Amino acid sequence: MYLYTLILLFLASVNVNAYADPGACSGNCWTHDPGLYQRKSDGKYFRFATGGGIHIASADSLEGPWTDDGYVLPNGSIIDLNGKNNLWAPDLHYRDGTYYLYYAVSSLGSQNSAIGVATSKTMEAGSWTDHGTTGIESTPASPYNAIDANWIAVGGTQYANFGSYWNNLFQVEMTNGLKVKSGATPHQIAYNASGIHRQEAAFMFERNDYFYLTFSGGIALGYNDTWPAPGEEYFISVCRSTSATGGFVDKNGVSCLNSGGTLLLASHGFVYGPGGQGILKDSSKGFVLYYHYADTRIGKAVEDYQFGWNQLKWENDWPSV
């Protein structure tokens, strides 16, 4: 009986400690669907978040202290859709001396959506120019929802990954960081066939000979009203491919187009519902997974969400936390 108890305690400790706790954060640590980038000129960190005209926070260290710097577009987007004053899901990239920030204009449960773009030379508040829609748009007649954009360049070709619920994740070729390539048609890159297809927040990155597609699944919010059934809250998964445009499979070889996905990060300890993730290639820490989560010691409302980050570990070219 004593041995059996020890075994149970050991298994419980393994489960609790399956993931590393988030890295340290001080100052303004609130975030929601974060976008994170390190400025090329001085290494300063800028963190962007869903809400209003896209929240801006900055710090000299990933650990903080983070300060609240205002908004990217304090007057909202020039895209004339419901939600233009409450922008979502920022995604950052840098190209030829300019920082690009993708954002989504939509409202909960709607497919009347568009992905917009703003540019800056510094990422500072007050420096951003809104260019409006990228041409990635959706209506109830579309097979996808045009939110949650993520940019990647492969050689000289640029792509935007996007999508949420409905038929999940899609990709389309871009002419540049501002507009979809004329005549380009989005194609599906991942799909969760179960239930109401809870999959969103694509983020793709390249390492060694692989392209990695991370995404969020599960229930993203509403935790202050009721806790989802265990395992149904937000979580982060990953697939990989030797091509950026398709063929993504999980660690077991299951296609991401057939509900595949290897769990990268899920609830553990005080961390509940991690998601809305991205990957930063940090100048000193290497590949860093960043995300928001509900800290059960603080609160479970969106207003209580916290900034989480972890350095990725690698085994056989698969990441873990």
Swiss-Prot record:
Residues 1-20 form the signal peptide. This is Probable arabinan endo-1,5-alpha-L-arabinosidase C. Belongs to the glycosyl hydrolase 43 family. Glycans are attached at residues 75, 192, 224. It is found in: Secreted. CDD domains: GH43_AnAbnA-like. It holds the Pfam family Glyco_hydro_43. Transmembrane segments: none annotated. It comes from Neosartorya fischeri (strain ATCC 1020 / DSM 3700 / CBS 544.65 / FGSC A1164 / JCM 1740 / NRRL 181 / WB 181) (Aspergillus fischerianus). The record marks 148 as: Important for catalytic activity, responsible for pKa modulation of the active site Glu and correct orientation of both the proton donor and substrate.
